[in-house]
Amino acid sequence: MAAAGGAALWRRLAAWLPRGPPGLAALLGRLSDRLSRGRDRRSRRSSWLLLAPLLTPPVPVITAMPCSLCPEGAHRFQWIRNLVPEFGISSSHVKVLSSPAEFYELLKVQIKTAKQRVVMASLYLGTGLLEQELVNCLEETLEKSLQANESPNLRVSILLDYTRGSRGRKNSRTMLIPLLQRFPEQVRVSLFHTPNLRGLLKLLIPERFNETIGLQHIKVYLFDDNVILSGANLSDLYFTNRQDRYVLLQDSPEIADFFTELVDAIGDVSLQLQQDDTVQMMEGMVHPYQGDKVRYCEIANQRVMEVIDSARTRQELLHAKTFHSSQQGSSMLPQHDSEASEGLKPEPDTWIYPLIQMKPFGIQIDEMVTETLLTEAERDAKIYLTTGYFNLTQAYMDLILGTRAEYRILLASPEVNGFFGAKGVAGAIPSAYVYIEHQFYNEVCCLHQQERVQLQEYSRAGWTFHAKGLWLYLAGSSLPCLTLIGSPNFGYRSVHRDLEAQVAIVTENKALQQQLHQEQEQLYLCSGVVSSSTFEQPSRHVKLWVKLVTPLIKNFF
């Protein structure tokens, strides 16, 4: 029965590749034949078979979210609140940052002034002097809290990826152990390990490449009631010359509570770093790679969805009498009445929607919302979409090519790709991205869509590029009313493998729209439009082996 089920799965996967590489389809077909013949497992212990389930994305089950968009204004996006909590705030609480240095200085200031909580989620913490300075700031703030109170209030929770945070002799873990040893009651360090990296696969894949199977990729930096959403990691490059995006949400306790609970939920299903550099799971928790995978993913899904659903319920109740009075459609209170009534805050002009994507746990909210935004974008609307690694899912590519809005897609030129100049196989990764970019550009040209869909490459001497997200300009508007900002980069890994989180910021405030517009312009100013001549440059030559391998490995990056 197991062999028959496996064969059926492989045949479905192979059938799902109408436009995929024939070599991959053939590989899946051969694997299905081998499964159906029921050969002894020992004769099939090849690394290719172990990797086979990862060579193609799972059969997609998501369709565009049905929605009824309001005809005018930012409120047309209120359908998102059917999926996630909606946080209404004043635009004066939102600040868009522009540079790595500004991001780094803000992190230090926020750590030093934190009184109640510091919550940081990142892929990893670097090991250089700048990162050590951050750790020192944490230590000083914890020490002050300890001296000020017999029962100190400050709690520090750090969530990192296990594989990336454990790489090398000096790593994220060794950077943080002194904090655990000095403040064991106040500091928690959680290391997420993907449930997909287990068994022989875990033994066979080298340390440098095991992160390709799946990661904790969320980047949230939270201090009391202030929240920074970004795509930047806690590493010196992201503090100096690696361009990313960053937004600060100030004095936003409800949003801070949500992301605290989200990080806690992921932390609860993660390995806990101990003072002696060992790790262990919380008592009673299923192990991510030694325990039952299905049960582990079920528990993780329940924990995360509890956070989302409870926050959504709280927000509906909290704002019932201000700007969404009831599900029956009763009118909202006038602003002067709501301000006068029991000291309520004025009606918000900006709405924050947290979008979570954790495909290993069956959570695909960000994917649903992104696909719906692309689907519903009207004719003459403009979408500026940026990604440091251009490897869009087939669904996103089809929507871009098949819908009506204008697209300006910003991506990294090979020279500002984070893998440019890397040793070994990793050094060929920029060429793989060039190959993917060229294929997409050819599709655009074949459909005669060059005017509607334009690619632009970011290029800046001495810098690398890691910005991701989008800005949506409604038809006839010169300013964006919506942006997506956070960790997802619209690629296969982001959608299918990693844990991701971003926010949709919807605003009616012209000053905030101007901030977002200036952010977009500043990034795009460092770019040039891609044309057919771009791929004729010597630096864009892609070796044959890269062209052959890229279709097989594109689901890993």
UniProtKB/Swiss-Prot annotation:
Span of chain positions assigned to the transit peptide in the UniProt entry: 1-25
PANTHER family named in the record: CDP-DIACYLGLYCEROL--GLYCEROL-3-PHOSPHATE 3-PHOSPHATIDYLTRANSFERASE, MITOCHONDRIAL, CDP-DIACYLGLYCEROL--SERINE O-PHOSPHATIDYLTRANSFERASE
Biased composition, class Basic and acidic residues, residue ranges: 336-346
Protein's GO biological process: cardiolipin biosynthetic process
UniProt keyword terms in alphabetical order: ATP-binding, Lipid biosynthesis, Lipid metabolism, Mitochondrion, Nucleotide-binding, Phospholipid biosynthesis, Phospholipid metabolism, Repeat, Transferase, Transit peptide
CDD domains, A to Z: PLDc_PGS1_euk_1, PLDc_PGS1_euk_2
Coiled coil: none
Reaction catalyzed: a CDP-1,2-diacyl-sn-glycerol + sn-glycerol 3-phosphate = a 1,2-diacyl-sn-glycero-3-phospho-(1'-sn-glycero-3'-phosphate) + CMP + H(+)
UniProt source species: Gallus gallus (Chicken)
Subcellular localization: Mitochondrion
Protein's recorded name: CDP-diacylglycerol--glycerol-3-phosphate 3-phosphatidyltransferase, mitochondrial
Source organism, top-level taxon: Eukaryota
Annotated ranges, domain PLD phosphodiesterase: 212-238, 461-494
Primary localisation category: mitochondrion
